[in-house]
Regions:
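Sec-dependent signal peptide recognition
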Residues: 1-3
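C-terminal motif of bacterial Sec signal peptides marking the signal peptidase cleavage site
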Residues: 8-12
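Cross-family detector of peptidyl-prolyl cis-trans isomerase
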Residues: 13-166
Length: 166
């Protein structure tokens, strides 16, 4: 009986979150579809999950970086980024750090970053559009980063600090 009450309570809470952010979710869905159909981005699919996608647009000549290393999901990378929402609201930036470098293991980021970074070469600069399903999903991360938020990153892959296979 207690388990039934807990499940019902959880379901009610999830429905409440979905109802509260319904317009925001629909706006994000619509905007993402517009970007997908715009022809400005390349659709990337995760090799580990065919339903996981991210959009990417390179800002550099990729022929100049094609021989540079690409990170593995277990690599530690140095990147610079600026994050905003679909409506232009700024969320975060590595440029607020002293050296403007964000160092992380690729697989310790949201799935959309994993998809994009493993396709980038050192030196590439891109805009990455991550649908909320490959971002933070239905989780509210802050008063700015609401549930169902698509993430738009301007990213430069600066270096692979550790190229680690396992």
């Amino acid at each position: 009986m207690l388990a039934l009450v807990a499940v019902t309570s959880l379901e009610s809470c999830l429905n409440s979150i979905e109802d509260e952010y319904k317009d925001w979710r629909l706006s994000n869905d619509s905007w993402y579809q517009q970007q997908l159909n715009s022809g400005q981005y390349t659709l990337l699919t995760a090799p580990w999950d065919p339903s996981a996608t991210t959009l990417i647009r390179w800002h550099n000549d990729t022929m100049l970086t094609k021989d540079n290393l690409k990170p593995l999901i277990t690599s530690t990378v140095d990147a610079k980024y600026y994050l905003r929402l679909y409506d232009g609201t700024p969320v975060d930036s590595s440029y607020t750090a002293t050296d403007s470098i964000y160092r992380s293991i690729v697989n310790q980021n949201v799935e959309g970053w994993m998809i994009a970074l493993t396709r980038m070469h050192v030196g590439d600069s891109c805009t990455i559009v991550i649908p909320y399903q490959q971002g933070y999903g239905s989780v509210k991360r802050s008063n700015v980063l609401l549930p169902y938020s698509n993430l738009i990153f301007d990213v430069k892959l600066v270096d692979i600090y550790k190229y680690k296979a396992n």
